Amino acid sequence: MVKVLKGDMGIVPALDIESHDHLERVVRETAKRDGVAGYKLGLTSVLRFGLAESVRRLRDLTDLPIIYDHQKAGPDMPDMAVKYTAMCKEADVDGLILFPVAGPTAVDSFAGEAIRAGLVPFVGGEIPVPDYGVSGGGYMLDDALDRILVRAVHNKVDHFVLPAHDRDKIVRWSKWIAANVASPLVVLTGFGALGGSIEVSFAAAAACQRRFAIVGRLITGSPTPGDAAARLYEQMRAVTAAA
């Protein structure tokens, strides 16, 4: 499968920004900074401009990879996978974040269709909120992501999304992924206010050599987004140098 994000580590700014002027400023200030590996495009721009137009505007600013996060695609009827993937392919994104919590068939359909279309599926299944799982008062089984990972690997997925807030879970998932996938890529998400830190999460995911971070407000909310991205990348470098 194509590797969308180059290298072994880096920052992927999450462009969940309502104003296009703000988005443009963030991209212009971060696109050439060391360690910025791509961008996550979310629904805020897409609902305003449409997916194809949002991607076009972003392509005018950078040639870095674009990963589309439909907040979160995958928990849907499996037959929607063909339609959804075709539209994303036509819009010229590079990868898709998928949380196929609707069951094994959803994993097969959404991940499988992405691969067949030449898009890279980044598969996850847990978000960093306290009451997501049953043990915290939520509705999802606590081992939902464990089950999704097994099915995703069966479908030849090798890019994964892990929440950054729980060190023990990151260690367990990363070791399992590394033992079952050749040269996997892991993106960690949920930093700052959501409880994750670069230092802790990157050290916890050390079983997987290729580690990236999707970071939103720590970058987009900064008066100097480029400097904020650079600081986070230096934190990554320090973790890997100390390993």
Annotated model-derived regions:
Residues 1-67, 75-78, 90, 151-157, ...:
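Conserved N-terminal beta1-alpha1 strand-loop-helix module at the mouth
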Residues 8, 75-168, 181-186:
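Conserved anion-binding
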Residues 9-15, 37-41, 66-70, 96-98, ...:
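Hydrophobic faces of well-ordered beta-strands that scaffold small-molecule active sites
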Residues 17-19, 43-47, 72-74, 100-102, ...:
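Active-site-proximal loop/turn and secondary-structure-junction residues that shape catalytic pockets
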Residues 23, 48-55, 104-107, 168-174, ...:
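Short, well-ordered alpha-helical microsegments
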Residues 28-31, 56, 112-114, 175-179, ...:
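Short, solvent-exposed amphipathic alpha-helical segments in soluble enzyme
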Residues 51-70, 112-126, 173-191:
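Alpha-helix-loop-beta-strand connector modules within alpha/beta enzyme cores
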Residues 164-219:
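A C-terminal functional module that forms or caps the active site or interfaces directly
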